[in-house]
Design a protein with these regions (language model features):
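Charged docking surfaces used in two-component/phosphorelay signaling
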Residues: 19-27
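Short hydrophobic/Thr-rich beta-strand motif most characteristic of the beta2 strand and flanking loop
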Residues: 29-36, 44, 107
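Conserved Asp/Asn-Gly motif in the active-site loop of CheY-like receiver
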Residues: 35-39, 95
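Active-site beta3 strand of CheY-like receiver
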Residues: 49-55
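Active-site residues of response regulator receiver
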Residues: 57, 87
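Receiver (REC) domain active-site loop signature in two-component systems and cognate sites
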Residues: 60
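C-terminal output helix
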Residues: 111-120
């Protein structure tokens, strides 16, 4: 990771998932903030322009991850945020659905930390 500390927004309606991801990412030198809903996450991303990536749980009550990602992609001030779909849905077509919504990457639960770190450091998906 570069010298600059990267800020990650973890969005999940399950506190256990937030706790686990935050513990690992903090130990790797990331600064983490959290949201428990899509609406709260969108508000945070609009208020804090130093968020480099968001880990988005796709299945949440209210505004789900798909809607959050679509809204974030429609907001030009959020184009710099790497949106990573994190979901327990791992059936055929789920990855494609997440990427079609605008996610830069897809990771299934339980999260493989090595894969997550690769996604955080890798190139952003080309926007068409």
């Amino acid at each position: 990771m570069s010298q600059q500390l990267k800020k990650i927004l973890i969005i999940d309606d399950d506190d256990r998932n937030i706790f686990a991801l935050k513990a690992v990412l903090t130990s790797k030198g990331y600064s983490c903030i959290t949201a428990v809903s899509g609406l709260q996450a969108l508000e945070i991303m609009q208020q804090q322009n130093d968020i480099s990536a968001a880990l988005v749980d796709m299945m949440m009550p209210g505004m789900d991850g798909y809607e959050l990602i679509e809204l974030a992609r429609e907001t030009s001030s959020l184009n710099h945020v790497r949106l990573i779909a994190v979901t327990a849905q791992a059936m055929m077509g789920d990855k494609e659905r997440c990427l079609a919504a605008g996610a830069d990457a897809y990771i299934s639960k339980p999260v493989d930390i090595d894969k997550l770190l690769q996604v955080l450091h890798g190139p952003l998906k080309q926007k068409g």
